[in-house]
Amino acid sequence: MKTIIIRKIPPIDDFKRFVPKRFSRFPQLYLELLENKNKVKLNCIGKEFVPTTPPLSTGRETIVSKDPHVVQSSISNTPIRTEIKDTPRYEETPIKRTITVTNVKTVKSSSISGMNGRNRLYDDDLFDDDRYKSPTTRKFQGEKRDEDIRLIPKSSNIGSSKYKPVLTRVEENENKKIHIDQRKESIVNDERKKNPEFREKPDKNEDKKVKPPPSLKEIENKGIDHEENEEDKKRELMFKLQLLQKQYPLRDIPDFTIRSEYKSMKKTYDIIVKQLSVDSSVETYKNYLVGGFMVCEMVFGRIGFDMEGFTQQQLLSMNSYEKLLLELGEKTYTPAGMDKWPVEVRLALAILFNAVWFIAAKMIMKKTKINILSLFNNTKGLNKSGTTPNSVSPRTWGNSKSPQSEFNFIGRKNENNSVGRTQMKGPSINRIDEGFGSESDESRREMREQGIETLK
């Protein structure tokens, strides 16, 4: 006979059965109340619940008693029934409970102090079952404590002055706080009535209150207001740029539209205003320089130095001071609205300075016979036209009546030599053609024929 050997092979990983995990049962189930936490008993948090009654059992355990017909239940707070074998009926006999009534004066102070807020946190009126009442330890089971004594007056007249309800520490503290708050409010109201200054002061608690978040309509309205304000600002900047274009037509000022970005418009406007203010400050400092040149010429001339023509020479070389004057103008630049002096005062000072400058130039012209004002104006015109003060157009070199004849230029060249540009060659003119147009047409023809014969 053939023998068959059966070997058990473990299944492949892909075909393994899924076995659910089984966890061991917990001895107790803890629940946490998430709603209505005002009713949560604080002293039960983090503590093991010890019931005052033994746990329920599935089967009823009988307690041996002297009376064989009485069957006592193991569960407390249940009625005791008598069981008769012959009859299925039974009678319920409730447990008699006694209530000790004592007077307030006879109660010791230690018993009242023992009634702290911990036991008062339990609301015994919520549930009738004893299981939900305040827990007691096993040590005091079956014993009466002073804390369990309830003070019940003999008479039903609770509002009488002889019997007053006993309050716990928590209730007493709450009453004290309420009394203190009421006292503070009365004092504050009295001060407000007496002092009008105190009445105007806002309440600090109002500032601390958290404002509710804005609604969607409020957010949309704010966005619309922001867009309208931005458009108004753009129009104002466009108007200012148009004014600058009229005042300074030679300046290249860009054009913007209402669709342009406000930030770029603002930056461009600030840069243009800064450039113009720096240029005006440079021109002002040039006047100061000319005044300084004249003072140096007069002072050093009195000492004994030959300083004649110093101011005229410095006016011609004014470009050497341009860099320093630009740095000084940028250093002293202040944005619009940031000046210490108002516009009216600055305008009056400018008029006063120009008057003093004009008087000084006239006095110098009488003594030295040099027109400083015309020299200074000519240097300004040359600088604005883009040419240097040392170069003048060749048309004015030979003209003594031109206003630039006061300048004495060294190294002057002839007009023919100075011109280096290539010129187009025109038709050659003979002496015969010099009188062309002065005689009649017949004489012109004769002269032309003679000229042609001579050329042949």
Curated annotation (Swiss-Prot):
TM region positions: 347-365
Coiled-coil ranges per UniProt: 216-248
Similarity section: Belongs to the IIV-6 067R family.
Membrane topology designation: Single-pass membrane protein
Ranges of Polar residues composition bias in the record: 383-407
Annotated protein name in UniProt: Uncharacterized protein 067R
CC terms in the record's Gene Ontology section: membrane
Biased composition (Basic and acidic residues): 181-210, 217-231, 441-456
The keyword Membrane appears for this protein: yes
Pfam families reported for this sequence: DUF5767
Location(s) in or outside the cell: Membrane
UniProt keyword Protein transport, yes or no: no
Chain segments carrying region Disordered: 181-231, 383-456
Keywords: Coiled coil, Membrane, Transmembrane, Transmembrane helix
Organism: Invertebrate iridescent virus 6 (IIV-6)
Disulfide bond positions: none
